Amino acid sequence: MKNLFEKLNYKGNKRIALLNSEDRFINDISIEFNDLTIDREIDPRFPYDFILVFAKKIADVEKYTPVALHNLLCDGVLWFCYPKKSSKKFKSDLDRDHGWKILNDSGYYGIRLVSIDEDWSALRFRYVKFIKSVSGRFPR
């Protein structure tokens, strides 16, 4: 799990938001990082440096994006995990290129893709003004 969190740009934050996750994922993280506070719902009074959202459908992206963006620190780390097309466990209307309109409309674009496990991929979103090399790919 530590290697995965390194890939996800986890920088040792003491408190993170992990939304809509399976219990097994929470348990694995809790065992590996026993001094980490994991919020399963956004605390509206807390600004997060690291938010990880599991979304099985576009509806999940639309549900969790507003609250995640509201509580994400300036240039905080925001990941959305979604089912792989090859997953035998999940079927989804999300993929690397589709289902992220609400994030794109808010100025957030997918910049990095990481494999979580056999069922999940994770896509990191970053606000356009913090993306170093845009080369016409993203609107400014």
Predicted features along the sequence, with ranges:
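Short, charged/polar "capping" segments at the starts of alpha-helices
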Residues: D23-I29, S87-F90
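Short acidic low-complexity segments
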Residues: T37-Y48
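Helix-to-beta-strand junctions that scaffold the AdoMet/dcAdoMet cofactor pocket
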Residues: L72-C74
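C-terminal substrate-binding/active-site "lid" region of AdoMet-derived donor-dependent transferases
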Residues: C81-L123
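A short, conserved alpha-helix within the catalytic core of class I
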Residues: I58-P66
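Short glycine-centered segments of the SAM/dcSAM-binding site in methyltransferase folds
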Residues: R15, G76-V77
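Flexible, glycine-/basic-rich loop-and-beta segments that form/coincide
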Residues: V128-R140
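Conserved class I S-adenosyl-L-methionine
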Residues: L8-S21
